[in-house]
């Protein structure tokens, strides 16, 4: 029994001290799109979409099938509600990068986009200060050069829903824009 226990402890401590940590180094960016679908007298309806971008070459984690966002009152920071958003078709898509002058090597740079939507519109009581939406996740990618410790730094994605009394207001839509920014 002593031999078994001593061998077990040697193997355990060897694995414990020699094993390498694994990090989810995959997130490279994201943004929210908020569309007001109904501006009511006491509450308003919004469609909320999150686009999340991950490194498909160096990342070791797949896109999550769902994400949970928080919606908070501006000024009070009170959590109004949380909302689960679902990955469209349960799969991300590889985004085209480059242009006529430059085509990056897909073995070095390949970005996957996950588009998340709610199953229903989000109904929020009209609040004169408005709301902010946030999503947080870990971790960034070592290819992000403007962070001190990207392997351990997360990302916060943020959007503001202004006071509905200002009129029907949605986030700006500039059409398809270059994904090379991510």
Which residues are covered by each model-predicted region?
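Bacterial Sec-dependent N-terminal signal peptides
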Residues: 1-28
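Long, compositionally biased, intrinsically disordered segments
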Residues: 22-182
């Amino acid at each position: 029994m002593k031999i078994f226990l001593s061998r077990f402890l040697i193997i355990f401590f060897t694995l414990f001290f020699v094993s390498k940590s694994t990090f989810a180094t995959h997130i490279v960016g994201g943004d929210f799109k908020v569309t007001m679908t109904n501006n009511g007298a006491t509450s308003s309806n919004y469609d909320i979409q999150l686009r999340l971008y991950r490194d498909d070459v160096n990342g070791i984690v797949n896109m999550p099938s769902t994400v949970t966002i928080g919606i908070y009152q501006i000024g009070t920071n009170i959590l109004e509600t949380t909302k689960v958003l679902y990955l469209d078709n349960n799969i991300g898509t590889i985004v085209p990068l480059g242009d006529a002058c430059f085509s990056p090597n897909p073995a070095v740079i390949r970005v996957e986009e996950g588009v998340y939507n709610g199953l229903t519109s989000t109904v929020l009581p009209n609040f004169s200060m408005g709301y902010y939406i946030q999503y947080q996740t870990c971790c960034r990618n070592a290819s992000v050069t403007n962070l001190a410790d990207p392997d351990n730094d997360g990302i916060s994605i943020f959007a503001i829903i202004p006071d509905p009394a200002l009129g029907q207001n949605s986030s700006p839509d500039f059409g398809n824009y270059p994904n090379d920014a991510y």
